[in-house]
Amino acid sequence: NKKYYDFILNISEDGWFGKSIGPKQHLAHSIFRSIEEGKNVIRSTNNGISAFVNPKGQIIKQISEKGYFDVNKIKRVDKTYFAEHGNKIFFYFVLIYTTFIVILKIRENK
């Protein structure tokens, strides 16, 4: 009995990045997770970029200074293929590719 949550909460301490591109990369990772899982992401940081990202990867609200924002409604979204099956799709691609290569090698040796 797995529970399905409507959002991902990402809490991060980005202070050690300094003035580098690190906080932007962390935000980008959150965007990818929202698309991958088909969930809203609420990202809270102390020295980085806090944001609310919808399941399509669009940044709805964002702040990079001290402050806060309210998230009023989080809509439930259906699971994506990746959320349902995980990395199985990559296994299938490798299996198909390997089978294809083996068939080519067998034909080449005839």
Segments from the language model and where they lie:
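CN hydrolase (nitrilase-like) catalytic-core segments centered on the catalytic cysteine
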Residues: 1-69
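Surface-exposed beta-strand edges and their flanking turn/coil or helix-capping segments
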Residues: 22-24, 56-57, 82-86, 96-98
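Short, charged/polar low-complexity linear motifs in solvent-exposed/disordered segments
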Residues: 36, 77-78, 108-110
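Short, surface-exposed, charge-dense and proline/glycine-enriched linear segments
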Residues: 39-44, 71-78, 96
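Short, aromatic-rich amphipathic segments at membrane interfaces
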Residues: 66-90
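Selective detector of the "anchor" transmembrane alpha-helix that sits immediately C-terminal
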Residues: 84-109
